[in-house]
C-alpha cells in the first residue's frame, strides 16, 4: 500500500518530498530577515528587550508567575553563589477564566495578584510568563493582543498586564514597587534552558515549543533588529520571538486548505495548523476522510471516521501499534486499510518534522556558528515529548542536513519559571 498512499498524498500536494528541505530553510531565512528589517513577512521576529548575554544577579529573590493555558503558578526563585537557580517557594491553582465561566479582565488581574501577593512582599523584581499573544514593550510590560480559547476573559485585549498587576498588588498592600518584565512561553523556555544547563557546554540556545501550538525564539545581535531602534540600543545579544507558528510560505494540500477554511483564523498560523498537536490530529483525520471520499477506504471506515473524535493520545497510540487495539485502528475495517492509514500518518509526520526542523536549521544558519558548535534546543510541548515519531525524525533530519552543528534537545523542568527568574534578575 505504500505506493498507493504516496501517490494519494502527492495528488493532494501533501507528500513531504513536495517541500524540499533546502527550499523550506531558504524561505524561513528570507522571512526572518524581512521581519527584522520591518518588511512584509509571515513571521514576526519580535524583540523581547531582554539581553541574552548578561548573567542574572545572585542571591536576590524574584517574583515569578507562570500564566499558562489551564494553570497559574507563582513563586520565588533566586540564583545561588554558583549561578544555579533555586526555587524558594511555589504554588499552583487553575488559571483565572479557565473554569468554564467567563470573567472580566479586572477579575483576572485581581486573582493573579492576590495569588502572588505573599511572594511579592519580599521581591523588588517580578516577571510573568504569559502563554498568550502579547506585544512586549521596551519597558518590559506587555499589551495583551488576545487570549486563547482555553480561558474566557472579556475585555483583556489592549491591557498592559504588568502595570495592571503592579497596581493591584499595591492596592493589596504589597510594599515598594516592583520592576516587571513579561516573556512568552518560547522565550521562557530558552531562558530556562540557559538557567539550568551547563553554559560552558553550548555555543547557542534556541527556544522551541511544539505542543498544542508551536513557536520558536532565538538569540540575535541587537544590531540586527533594524525595525526597532529601542532593541538596537540595547547592544549585545537579545532574544527574539520568531512567532514561527505563523510561517506561511508552505505548500498547502487539500486537507490543509479545507481545515484552514473552517478554522477561527483562516489564512493565519499556517505552519501551526500543519505541525502542532492541536491541529495535526485534525490534519490526519481530514486526510483519511478525503481518502474515504475517493473510495480508498471502505464505507464502514468512512462512517467510523466521521464519528471519531481523534485526540493526540490516539494518534500516539496508532503510531506505536497501527494494527493494535486503539480507537483509530478500530475505526478502520481491515489490516490493509490500517496499513494504508499508517503510511499516511508516517508521511504526514515526516512533513511536520521537516517543517519544524527547517525552522531550527534557518536559525542556526542565520547565527553562522562555527563548525563543531553545540546548540541547546530548549524544548517543550506535548507533541515533542509524547509523539513517538516526530522528535526522532526531527533529530535525524537535523543530523543529516546540518552536520556541522550538533543540536541537542533538552526538556527543562519548570523552564518558564526559571526563565522568568533569569529575565527578572538581569538588566536594571
Where are these regions (language model features)?
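A short acidic Gly-Thr/Ser loop motif
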Residues: 65-73, 131, 186-187, 208-213, ...
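Short glycine-aspartate micro-motif
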Residues: 60-66, 125-127, 179-181, 205-209, ...
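Short, acidic Gly/Pro/Ser/Thr-rich loop/turn segments
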Residues: 72, 133-137, 215-217, 249
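Short glycine-enriched loops at secondary-structure junctions
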Residues: 78-81, 128-134
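Glycine-rich phosphate-binding loop of actin/hexokinase-like ATP-binding domains
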Residues: 84-87, 150-156, 191-283, 289
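ATP-binding/phosphotransfer module of carbohydrate and carboxylate kinases, centering on a glycine-rich
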Residues: 1-90, 94-124, 170, 195-196, ...
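Glycine-rich phosphate-binding loop and adjoining helix at the ATP-binding site
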Residues: 93-110, 134-199, 204-206, 222-246, ...
Amino acid at each position: 500500500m505504500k505506493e498507493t498512499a504516496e501517490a494519494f498524498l502527492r495528488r493532494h500536494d501533501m507528500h513531504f518530498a513536495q517541500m524540499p528541505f533546502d527550499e523550506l530553510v531558504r524561505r524561513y531565512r528570507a522571512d526572518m530577515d524581512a521581519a527584522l528589517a520591518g518588511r512584509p513577512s509571515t513571521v514576526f521576529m519580535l524583540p523581547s528587550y531582554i539581553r541574552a548575554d548578561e548573567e542574572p544577579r545572585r542571591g536576590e529573590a524574584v517574583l515569578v508567575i507562570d500564566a499558562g493555558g489551564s494553570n497559574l503558578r507563582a513563586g520565588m526563585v533566586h540564583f545561588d553563589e554558583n549561578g544555579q537557580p533555586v526555587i524558594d517557594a511555589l504554588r499552583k491553582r487553575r488559571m483565572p477564566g479557565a473554569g468554564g465561566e467567563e470573567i472580566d479582565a479586572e477579575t483576572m488581574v485581581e486573582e493573579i495578584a492576590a495569588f502572588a501577593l505573599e511572594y511579592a512582599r519580599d521581591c523588588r523584581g517580578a516577571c510573568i510568563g504569559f502563554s498568550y499573544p502579547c506585544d512586549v514593550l521596551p519597558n518590559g510590560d506587555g499589551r495583551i493582543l488576545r487570549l486563547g480559547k482555553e480561558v474566557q476573559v472579556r475585555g483583556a485585549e489592549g491591557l498592559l498586564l504588568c502595570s495592571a498587576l503592579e497596581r493591584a498588588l499595591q492596592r493589596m498592600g504589597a510594599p515598594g514597587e516592583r520592576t516587571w518584565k513579561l516573556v512568552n512561553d518560547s522565550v521562557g523556555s530558552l531562558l530556562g534552558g540557559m538557567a539550568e544547563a551547563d553554559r560552558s557546554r553550548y555555543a547557542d540556545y534556541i527556544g522551541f515549543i511544539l505542543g498544542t501550538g508551536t513557536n520558536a525564539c532565538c538569540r540575535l545581535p541587537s544590531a540586527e533588529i533594524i525595525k526597532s531602534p529601542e532593541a538596537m540600543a540595547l547592544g549585545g545579544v537579545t532574544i527574539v520571538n520568531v512567532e514561527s507558528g505563523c510561517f506561511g510560505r508552505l505548500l498547502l494540500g487539500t486537507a490543509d486548505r479545507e481545515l484552514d477554511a473552517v478554522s477561527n483564523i483562516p489564512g493565519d498560523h499556517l505552519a501551526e495548523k500543519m505541525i502542532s498537536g492541536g491541529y495535526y490530529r485534525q490534519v490526519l483525520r481530514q486526510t483519511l476522510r478525503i481518502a474515504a471520499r475517493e473510495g480508498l477506504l471502505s464505507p464502514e471506515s468512512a462512517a467510523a471516521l466521521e464519528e471519531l473524535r481523534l485526540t493526540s493520545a490516539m494518534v500516539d497510540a496508532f503510531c506505536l501499534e497501527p494494527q493494535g487495539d486503539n480507537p483509530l485502528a478500530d475505526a478502520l475495517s481491515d489490516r490493509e486499510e490500517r496499513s494504508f492509514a499508517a503510511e499516511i500518518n508516517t508521511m504526514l509526520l515526516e512533513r511536520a518534522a521537516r517543517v519544524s526542523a527547517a525552522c531550527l536549521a534557518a536559525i542556526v544558519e542565520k547565527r553562522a556558528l562555527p563548525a563543531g558548535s553545540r546548540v541547546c534546543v530548549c524544548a517543550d510541548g506535548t507533541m515533542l515529548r509524547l509523539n513517538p515519531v516526530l522528535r526522532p525524525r526531527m533529530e535525524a533530519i537535523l543530523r543529516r542536513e546540518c552536520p556541522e552543528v550538533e543540536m541537542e534537545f533538552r526538556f527543562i523542568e519548570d523552564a518558564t519559571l526559571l526563565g522568568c527568574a533569569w529575565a527578572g534578575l538581569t538588566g536594571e
